[in-house]
Amino acid sequence: MGKIIGIDLGTTNSCVAVLEGDKAKVIENAEGARTTPSIIAYTDDKETLVGQAAKRQAVTNPENTLYAVKRLIGRRFDDKVVQKDIKMVPYKITKADNGDAWVEVKGEKMAPPQISAQVLKKMKKTAEDYLGEAVTEAVITVPAYFNDSQRQATKDAGRIAGLDVKRIINEPTAAALAYGLDKKGGDRTIAVYDLGGGTFDISIIEIAEVDGEHQFEVLATNGDTFLGGEDFDLALINFLADQFKADSGIDLGGDPLAMQRLKEAAEKAKIELSSAEQTEVNLPYITADSTGPKHLVVKVTRAKLESLVGDLVTRSLEPCKTALADAGVKTADITDVILVGGQTRMPMVQKSVTEFFGKEPRKDVNPDEAVAMGAAIQGAVLSGDVTDVLLLDVTPLTLGIETMGGVMTPLIEKNTTIPTNASQVFSTADDNQTAVTVHVLQGERKQASQNKSLGQFNLEDIPPAPRGMPQIEVTFDIDANGILHVGAKDKATGKEQTIQIKASSGLSDEEIDQMVQDAEAHADEDKKFEELVQTRNQADHLVHATRKTLEEAGDKATDEEKEAITKAVDELEEAAKGSDKDDIEAKIKALSEVSAPLAEKMYAEQAQQAQGAAGAEGEQPQAGDDVVDAEFEEVDDDKKK
């Protein structure tokens, strides 16, 4: 059985880890980095770039460079947060036929899980290159406050990427695993404050030693799935754009290229201000008008940045209060505070967390890597490689159904340990009603319409009876991934219907299968493209070498030889401009055959000179550095060995 890898699929960056021995190891990608930007770009020559390569070209290709797509996953197009996002990003967010938020690139509509699958494929390949074996199973992390649709969509992304997702695990819980696995001595209650690129979570977790086993029990979780580093960046971008408008009278908002440069500069300035008190944003030739080019030069102090993002930091503290209350603990009961997510490197965030909890956060947890490491540990637990860990997570939001009068009736309260199930008996609202619609909801509001609709289904063929008489038992079952299965049963007839909740949004199995096939087709295309490039390079090398041989041969080549070789060279050059690999290979073979006699003649002549003339071997390199000489010297070197 292969390794189960752990993947932190982040809004801004992603990370992959695997358990080696008893330690989780973060795997470096092909570029040598331990994290990979969650950015995907589609170029004009139909190439798909993922990670650093996509980030590098974002300034010149903003409309086709997708970032922070995780904020759209499992969301409806009409959601307020999606409408806000449309104004923030240079790429096109569009409405899918089922009402979901999708993206459109070069006229093609794509679902967020499809985009995220590209990042997951890169993580999968990174792990495979390191392990030297195929990887098919993974544990993928999600924000603790993700709802059912978002969890299901993340699982779909894994499937499209060719991964069997063994478990969806909450990011703060994963970080707690990474932190607490090797800690000995007594029970502890920790707070994991996770402020990432696009989402915020707070989890209160109890770590206990029970019969020699590490037990991680989540007491409560809360958060905001639209609060993260991207919002901090946006606050600074808006400030810089406003400053530029005040100085030059030009609004950069309508210029995607300028805004992309501004985004990169803002992110860089934000990072610099975590260690410096002041930085300068300097963007020459940001735009131009009739008076000439314009340059953006703005000094930003740490104090200024803090004033711009103060409300965002404050926003993160409300869920902390709720989580503590739900867990039934006070700040004084918290043993350790763990910071996760790149945005927690900001001194203002650290200061606010310290003041809120009354203690300094731990510094021995890497905020960028802890989540992936925890996912790898959970993978090892599932594969049986780690046996002394028990993880008890919770469902972040209340689950229930809509009942008469548009009220939400809860069946499973938030912060219930999962897996779990609950059932309740309901009845009909009208006389002789023969069917009931079970409308499944997730959220904390009493009014059904104010909660997230996870989907609905009908239980039919109920025998006619006065209202209130039929006994309809509705059962909710949440699996260890936090994904809901719902059943309804008429107790009189025993008729039952069970479904795994698939929201009216979300991808159907057929759509996912099609996306898996598309991904596989793209993999074949990529392989063919790579082979074509290699063949072209081979052709280019042969053309160059043959021309040098002709040049060196001079009068030693007959006119017929020169004509035949030149014709074959021209034909190969022409073939290499096209995309027919077989044709290029045929022309390579033809040129090799027609030029071989001349190459052999030259080689024999040089060998004769080398043997006949005293000291000729020392002078030989001066004859030129063509391919024939190179081959001659290689043979000579081999002889010397």
Curated annotation (Swiss-Prot):
CDD domains: ASKHA_NBD_HSP70_DnaK-like. Keywords: ATP-binding, Chaperone, Nucleotide-binding, Phosphoprotein, Stress response. Residues 626-641 have a biased composition (Acidic residues). Residues 602-641 are annotated as: Disordered. The modification Phosphothreonine is found at residue 199. PROSITE patterns: HSP70_1, HSP70_2, HSP70_3. Pfam families: HSP70. Residues 604-625 have a biased composition (Low complexity). SUPFAM superfamilies: Actin-like ATPase domain, Heat shock protein 70kD (HSP70), C-terminal subdomain, Heat shock protein 70kD (HSP70), peptide-binding domain. InterPro entries: ATPase_NBD, Chaperone_DnaK, Heat_shock_70_CS, HSP70_C_sf, HSP70_peptide-bd_sf, Hsp_70_fam. Induction: By stress conditions e.g. heat shock. One of its GO terms (molecular function) is ATP binding. Signal peptide: none annotated. Acts as a chaperone. Belongs to the heat shock protein 70 family. This is Chaperone protein DnaK. The gene is dnaK.
